[in-house]
Amino acid sequence: MAFCSPAMMNYNIASNFGDSESASVRQTSSPSLLWSAPGHLSPLTLHCQLSLLYAEQPKSPWCEARPLEPVLPVSRETLKRKTNGSDCTSPIASNPGSKRDAHFCAVCSDYASGYHYGVWSCEGCKAFFKRSIQGHNDYICPATNQCTIDKNRRKSCQACRLRKCYEVGMMKCGSRRERCGYRILRRHRNSEDCMGKTKKYNEAATRVKEILLSTVSPEQFVLTLLEAEPPNVLVSRPSKPFTEASMMMSLTKLADKELVHMIGWAKKIPGFIDLSLYDQVRLLESCWLEVLMIGLMWRSIDHPGKLIFAPDLVLDRDEGKCVEGILEIFDMLLAMTSRFRELKLQHKEYLCVKAMILLNSSMFPLSAEEPESNRKLHHLLNVVTDALVWVIAKSGIPSQQQTTRLANLLMLLSHVRHASNKGMEHLLSMKCKNVVPVYDLLLEMLNAHTLRGQRKSPVTHPDFEQVSHFQV
């Protein structure tokens, strides 16, 4: 009595134990196969054989072994397609003991389930690409558009995952090819043709973005800047009496928190993420302290004699005396804030000026490998300038005064740069004297300032790729 026929377990036995030439396949209809599943077969393999199990007509005795008699005649090629097709597509599932024929997902390097949309891909990446091309696909990378996409981190950034799908050659037309030309595509995939189509797609997408940016009205651009504004950051006020270490610790913690929000703010400026990664990083490295300072001035504009570093950190001039060398910087910040107050700086003007500081900080050679990025940057600067001119014109003052006001606002930017340089020197001095420890993004920005003249390419801090740090 055989409760588990070898035929059901994919073993071939001879009809006569002494005659190996007359081997035949035997199969049992016993349901005991469901009671005691062989341990060496995967659940996916058993699932593939389920249809054959239910197709039998249980007319034989309980334990009698009889030749395999399928209800429908199935050829070898049909079985091969069924085993390797939609029901059990994975090469690993069809033969658990061998990885020789295994294919890997071109996007995340997981085991591929089949040839989808023109490339080998897993079920997860296939479904993600299908959702992206059929519906929502306006993803934004919260880091620097170079997130690592692998089996464990493929869900961390949708924008970089979709970009990699296009880079490896996934395309809409691939959905039909995988059904009708599977074997031909498997043997004769033309990678150069796929890359060429991807390049054409990227070029077309770039042209569309440029057209959309050029058609954005100044009002729409300013509204986008308004929506991109980062939230207020809270930091604990040091307890009195203030010391040099406690004061600098509070200021550096605040700066590090604001830097994280600044990266998200920059990426929301229309057209910024279309610049090369090199230019994006260099712009942020060059102006981060200027952006922080003009934000401080805007928060302090209605509080004469006070510097509103944060809602819970308000300092006056005398409280800066405890830190060596910072009093001069406090005086510069208070003087510029007073000048903005005299000009009655409006919120929309402040938004445009802050964006202009970021985009006009290119006091370095831009990426020679990507001249298009340089052209995009100049175009983006023109868009910001037009927005500032529009905001001033909307104030209703005479045209001659509009020109004078624009000049007055732009002239203050050089003073902001000067205060930023002073602040950078002071912060580096405090760091070298070990007055206060510096970590994370703030340390990266300081190192970039120190090594700017010695390196050829920007260095990105690991935090730039941590999606959890950037709320875009």
Swiss-Prot record:
A GO MF annotation of the entry reads:
steroid binding
PROSITE patterns of this UniProt entry? NR_LBD, NUCLEAR_REC_DBD_1, NUCLEAR_REC_DBD_2
Return the Pfam families for the record.
Answer: ERbeta_N, Hormone_recep, zf-C4
InterPro entries, per the entry? ER-beta-like_N (IPR021064), ER-beta/gamma (IPR028355), Est_rcpt/est-rel_rcp (IPR024178), NHR-like_dom_sf (IPR035500), Nucl_hrmn_rcpt_lig-bd (IPR000536), Nuclear_hormone_rcpt_NR3 (IPR050200), Nuclear_hrmn_rcpt (IPR001723), Znf_hrmn_rcpt (IPR001628)
> Which interval of the chain is the signal sequence?
none
Residues of the region (Modulating) are: 1-104
Q: Which residues form a coiled coil?
A: none
Q: Where are the zinc fingers (NR C4-type)?
A: 105-125, 141-165
Q: In which tissues is it expressed?
A: A high expression is seen in the telencephalon, diencephalon, pituitary, testis and kidneys but little or no expression is seen in the cerebellum, pectoral muscle and adrenal gland.
UniProt GO BP: cellular response to estradiol stimulus; estrogen receptor signaling pathway
Per the record, what about its domains? Answer: Composed of three domains: a modulating N-terminal domain, a DNA-binding domain and a C-terminal ligand-binding domain.
Q: What is this protein called?
A: Estrogen receptor beta
